[in-house]
UniProtKB/Swiss-Prot annotation:
Gene Ontology biological process terms in this record: pantothenate biosynthetic process
Any one Gene Ontology cellular component term annotated for this protein: cytosol
Protein's recorded name: Pantothenate synthetase
Subunit field text: Homodimer.
GO molecular function terms listed in the Swiss-Prot or TrEMBL record: ATP binding; pantoate-beta-alanine ligase activity
CDD domains, alphabetized: PanC (cd00560)
Phylogenetic placement of the source organism: Bacteria, Pseudomonadati, Pseudomonadota, Gammaproteobacteria, Alteromonadales
Annotated ATP binding sites: 30-37, 149-152, 178, 186-189
Length: 281
């Protein structure tokens, strides 16, 4: 696997592949890779001739008092895992390469509406940071296809909307959430959990599953939400949000809506965990 921090190196290699008529897949990450990331790379390798991965802890998407400095950086282990999974080109830029004028002077991309609710309301500016870095990475790598995890459901919709609105010629593929044996969605932030918290963490998925089951049986959204919040609090969580939304617009769920998604974010100790479930009523 070729590794470089330099934009020109990435473009040169991708151009060489394109000159051969070969296809390129892209998986953007912030590193500290787990099996969920590796699954994205393996799926990318099945779909395209070559796989490019980026590792960049993006300062633009972290708010004040968030864990930018504490975010784990494990480049050596990540490189080994990526090589084994079939990645051929790894882009590891520094903030100075990505944002040479600094964040305050950086042109940014903002996806209106869908960026402002749920995680966007809890973390103002987060999705502006996500959309900007993903758009910038797309312009550097120029992939045919890009892969993202369905675990970050709102992020995936923000990126799909950006690609559509800006007419970017890139196919976006969402890959099912990879879970630990307990049902806990894999996340780099799971490393913040104590053993006791890790034992309690599967309650998040159980609460979401119970909500979906209740809605399918005709129980009101208000009732299933209150019951789920109570179960999370009893398990030691501090809920941030727990909501039922339209699956493609993230508008509040209406009685006539069939395609729904439950989205949850909750604190367990130091870790902010998110999860979701898309289902038909």
């Amino acid at each position: 696997m070729i590794t470089s921090a330099h934009i020109d190196d990435i473009r040169t290699q991708v151009r060489a592949w394109r000159a051969q008529g070969e296809t390129v897949a892209f998986v953007p990450t912030m590193g500290n890779l787990h099996q969920g990331h590796i699954t994205l790379v393996k799926e990318a390798a099945k779909k395209c001739d070559h796989v490019v991965v980026s590792i960049f802890v993006n300062p633009m998407q972290f708010g004040q008092n968030e864990d930018l400095d504490a975010y784990p950086r494990t480049l050596e282990a990540d490189s080994q895992a990526l090589t084994a999974a079939g990645a051929e080109l790894l882009f590891t830029p520094t903030p100075a390469i990505i944002y040479p004028k600094g964040l305050a002077q950086q042109t940014y991309v903002e996806v209106p509406g869908i960026s402002d609710v749920l995680c966007g309301a809890s973390r103002p500016g987060h999705f502006r940071g996500v959309a900007t870095i993903v758009c910038k990475l797309f312009n550097i790598v120029l992939p045919d296809v890009a892969f993202f995890g369905n675990k970050d459901y709102q992020q995936l919709l923000v990126i799909r909307t950006m690609v559509e609105d800006l007419s970017l010629p890139i196919e976006i593929i969402g890959v099912d959430t990879i879970r630990e044996a307990s049902g806990l969605a894999m996340s780099s932030r799971n490393g913040y959990l104590t053993e006791e918290e890790k034992a309690a963490a599967p309650a998040l998925k159980k609460a979401i599953d119970a909500m979906a089951q209740g809605i399918k049986q005709g129980v009101s959204i208000e009732q299933v939400t209150e019951e789920a919040k109570a179960s999370l609090i009893a398990a030691g969580f501090t809920p941030d949000y727990l909501e039922v939304r339209h699956a493609t617009t993230l508008a509040n769920a209406e009685p006539q809506d069939q395609a729904l998604v439950i989205l949850a974010a909750a604190y367990l100790g130091k870790a902010r965990l998110i999860d979701n479930l898309r289902f038909d009523r």
